């Protein structure tokens, strides 16, 4: 399968970014990596993350059929070992949670991947409730 991932220039927005990743068997793949997947106590990893030029607004175009029109068995192209431990809260109590591989974090691990820069105007995130107050999320009134 093929994924073309739109990336915008990084301007202090949270989110994953395009990185080369070395797997356990030494294979090198292109991945969208979330901050939670990075060992922030490793200065080398932190430097790579901080110097990244782009991040992913999650604009993907996906090809899920082969050249004969047959659907790929997408499970064969995922990496079940890419789950991560994150911190969540419930009733004011901090909890650790095991997150299974996400769609682009592990579910598309072995896909052919192309990163392309897209215009910033395509990026209108809603990461928190106040983002809905921004002009780009308001209805057009004529």
Residue ranges and their predicted role:
Residues 1-142:
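OB-fold and OB-like single-stranded nucleic-acid-recognition modules
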């Amino acid at each position: 399968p093929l994924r073309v991932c739109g990336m915008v220039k990084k301007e202090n927005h949270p989110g994953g970014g395009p990185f080369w990743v070395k797997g356990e068997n030494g294979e090198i793949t292109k991945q969208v990596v979330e901050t939670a997947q990075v060992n922030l106590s490793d200065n080398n990893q932190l430097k790579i993350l901080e110097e990244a030029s782009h991040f992913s607004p999650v604009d993907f175009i996906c090809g899920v059929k082969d050249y004969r029109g047959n659907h790929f068995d997408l499970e064969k192209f995922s990496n079940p070992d890419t789950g991560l431990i994150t911190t969540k809260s419930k009733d004011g109590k901090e909890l650790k949670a095991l997150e299974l591989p996400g769609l682009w974090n592990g579910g598309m691990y072995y896909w052919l991947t192309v990163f392309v820069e897209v215009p910033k105007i395509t990026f209108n995130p809603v990461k928190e409730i106040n983002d809905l107050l921004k002009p780009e999320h308001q209805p057009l009134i004529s």
